């Protein structure tokens, strides 16, 4: 089947479920596909997707766009179209498992004759999602719990694997205000950028090098870089090496301290006790002193692998003594002390 010069649009598509335990309505204004040539699609878009559950919550997505799609076989496209055409006549309970099975068939890793996982080319080149909203009560925009203006994933290559991801979103602090207070913050803006590149480590192991930045606006920025290793699909053998973390504090430590004890003088008195505890647990006085310096005057905290070639199993991150042996920690104090930052926080 070849419609390389055509754009095919289906919609609107509406699906509803009257099951008493989870009544649900969902709709997609339009699904468009263009540039189809058997196993390849140039572009697919879904416009104005909405799911309402029990008239109490809603998920809305302005647009989903996938480019340069490579399907598992030539028949997959026909099965997908058949399911879309029958969507209005199917219940959610029937439609969802069939759609999920088709997606998993396209996304699952292929294996060679030796049973090793392999792919001949990326499943898609780019996936972009715009204007995603999770709303507690449909129709009440002031109860928008989560809004993502932009999410994007670029699959740039297989030899080596290369991915780039980005996310810009904001979310309400309402769901956790009773457990965790952030004075002056009704919503938090989060930004994330990541670049993942396949490489071969010193021991000949296949690794993924991940670098990126995670930002909580007005709270903190985290720059990270590390090599990730895992051969087990369950990732129980997951390990990292050549770790680099740089935390730039813009108020996050003051918020955490406020939720432990809102009295600045109480937190100041707690610092010597914390320093003694850190020295004992980490087994490295220099690391403990760096953390205490950061907590006393939050500024920047840097963490590096002592030996960049040494793999650190994830389970060892739960062992303070192991962290003390494998990591080197340094700190640059901020301009204001923790009590001063807490007072400024409470003045908002």
Q: What is each residue range found by the language model?
A:
Residues 4-348:
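Glycine-rich, small/hydroxylated-residue low-complexity segments
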């Amino acid at each position: 089947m070849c419609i390389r010069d055509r754009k095919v649009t289906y919609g609107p598509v509406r699906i509803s479920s009257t099951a008493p335990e989870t009544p649900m309505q969902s709709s997609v204004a339009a699904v468009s596909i263009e540039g189809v040539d058997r196993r390849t699609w140039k572009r697919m878009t879904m416009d104005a997707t909405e799911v309402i559950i029990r008239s109490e919550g809603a998920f809305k997505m302005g647009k989903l766009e996938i480019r340069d799609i490579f399907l598992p076989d030539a028949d997959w496209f026909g099965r997908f179209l058949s399911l879309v055409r029958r969507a209005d006549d199917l219940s959610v309970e029937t439609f969802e498992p069939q759609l999920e099975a088709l997606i998993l068939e396209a996304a699952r890793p292929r294996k060679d004759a030796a049973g090793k996982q392999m792919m001949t080319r990326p499943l898609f080149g780019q996936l972009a999602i715009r204007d995603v909203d999770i709303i507690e009560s449909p129709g009440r925009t002031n109860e928008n719990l989560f809004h993502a203006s932009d999410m994007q994933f670029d699959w740039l290559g297989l030899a080596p694997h290369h991915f780039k991801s980005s996310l810009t979103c904001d979310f309400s602090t309402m769901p956790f205000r009773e457990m965790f207070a952030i004075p002056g913050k009704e919503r938090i803006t989060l930004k994330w950028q990541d670049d993942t590149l396949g490489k071969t480590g010193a021991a000949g192991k296949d690794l993924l090098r991940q670098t990126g930045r995670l930002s909580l606006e007005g709270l903190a920025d985290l720059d990270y870089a590390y090599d990730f290793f895992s051969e087990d699909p369950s990732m129980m053998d997951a390990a990292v090496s050549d770790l680099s973390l740089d935390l730039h504090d813009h108020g996050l430590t003051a918020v955490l301290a406020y939720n432990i004890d809102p009295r600045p003088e109480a937190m100041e008195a707690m610092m010597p006790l914390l320093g003694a505890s850190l020295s004992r647990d980490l087994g490295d006085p220099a690391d403990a002193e760096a953390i205490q310096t950061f907590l006393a005057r939050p500024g920047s905290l840097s963490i590096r692998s002592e030996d960049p070639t040494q793999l650190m199993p994830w389970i060892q991150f739960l062992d303070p003594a192991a962290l003390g042996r494998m990591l080197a920690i340094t700190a640059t104090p901020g301009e204001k002390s923790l009590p001063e930052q807490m007072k400024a926080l409470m003045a908002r």
